[in-house]
């Protein structure tokens, strides 16, 4: 009888603690048990079913994945052992312990979990049954998400599929691409679909590849958002956020007279988006009003990165056939291929002037005429104003008249002295002398916007500040209504 009690005690300890039976206590390593549970009259001499201590543990499974075991009615005896295993307990053989398995329900996954995990917009509508499917298979949320798993998850939601988007209106067409106004079935929001035709011999145009590679890494409130990329055998479709119009259309709608407070807001946002690009070592290289998009709230965003480049060093040789002629700096017009972020700053100055006056500053139709317009207002450069210019072969070939510089205020009377000073700092002959986007944002011209506007996170709009509001235009006419008779949005200049 004592032997039976020892066996019962050891078995109880094994089930309670998950430990093997001590081989040094005189009990055999393998314990014989009657299949019926071991009644008081069991015959220990019969051939037993043998269970090794390790097998007892394997029944429970690994500790990390074992269901929680709740012991019931575990009354303790005076010797610190449970009554079931105590030497003072009844001689009747009973089940050593009674256990109740507690199975935790699967973690319930919410739409917010999905949005945060996959960086999705807050208003996305997930496919029917998608949350329930993930709830049944939730380990995805307990470990890092691999690139492959992320792609699979996005595809299951509907990203990367043409059928997710509805084409509404055709907005424009270029050599390689057509732009449509569309609607997303995932969010019910309007989108711009830039459909790039893939030539069988050439594949995707390098400008499209460049735009995709840069935009997917640029996350800023003043840079157009690339929502999705759809690749088929015949086309590459880029899905952009939809904005109501571009700056050129905004100027037209205002009768080419923009409220000067709004000019300041637009210019600040242009500089803010550009400063972010330059910090990321990206040059836009094609700034013009048609590539600056504006929504009804007044948010301005940089678009069309088809000519943009990532730069690795301050100056590098690139093609000089960039930037629409009116916004092209004189050093590039004269053949320079060594430039950096300063190439964008000249274009900012031209756009600033155009917003303030309603007309382009240098509307040349040829390179020679463009330089003539520049020199007539800013003065023909000399060795004093532009060291080394006289050794430039193209400059000597044109043989321009000796113009004297004119005061910019005489051409842009709506600018105050701070505005004229900022414009002068942007329109410098030499790229190295042009003010940077980061420094331009700190110019006194923007003091009236307050200090908080400089402390916003990159992805936060300036209109998140209650003190920043777009003012109503005096002569604005709406062209964003469906019956206006012309497209209200131009996502990019698609002439690659």
From Swiss-Prot:
Topological type in the membrane: Peripheral membrane protein
GO biological-process terms attached to the record: exocytosis; growth hormone secretion; neuron projection development; positive regulation of autophagy; regulation of cell cycle phase transition; regulation of insulin secretion involved in cellular response to glucose stimulus; spermatogenesis
Entry keyword annotation includes RNA-binding: no
Keyword Thylakoid: no
Catalytic activity: L-seryl-[protein] + ATP = O-phospho-L-seryl-[protein] + ADP + H(+); L-threonyl-[protein] + ATP = O-phospho-L-threonyl-[protein] + ADP + H(+)
GO cellular component, one term: nucleus
A molecular function (GO) term: protein serine kinase activity
Residues annotated with Phosphoserine modification: 12, 36, 65, 78, 82, 89, 95, 110, 119, 138, 146, 153, 155, 391, 478, 480
Superkingdom field: Eukaryota
The protein's Enzyme Commission number: 2.7.11.22
Entry keywords, A to Z: ATP-binding, Cell membrane, Cytoplasm, Cytoplasmic vesicle, Differentiation, Kinase, Membrane, Nucleotide-binding, Phosphoprotein, Serine/threonine-protein kinase, Spermatogenesis, Synapse, Synaptosome, Transferase
Gene3D superfamilies reported for this sequence: Phosphorylase Kinase, domain 1, Transferase(Phosphotransferase) domain 1
Subunit comment: Found in a complex containing CABLES1, CDK17 and TDRD7. Interacts with BRSK2. Identified in a complex with NSF, syntaxin-1, synaptotagmin, SYN1, SYP and CDK5R1. Interacts with YWHAH, YWHAQ and YWHAZ. Interacts with CCNY; this interaction increases the CDK16 kinase activity. Interacts with CCNYL1; this interaction mutually increases the stability of CDK16 and CCNYL1 and increases the kinase activity of CDK16. Interacts with NSF.
Name of this chain's protein: Cyclin-dependent kinase 16
Species whose genome carries this gene: Rattus norvegicus (Rat)
Lineage: Eukaryota, Metazoa, Chordata, Craniata, Vertebrata
Protein's gene: Cdk16
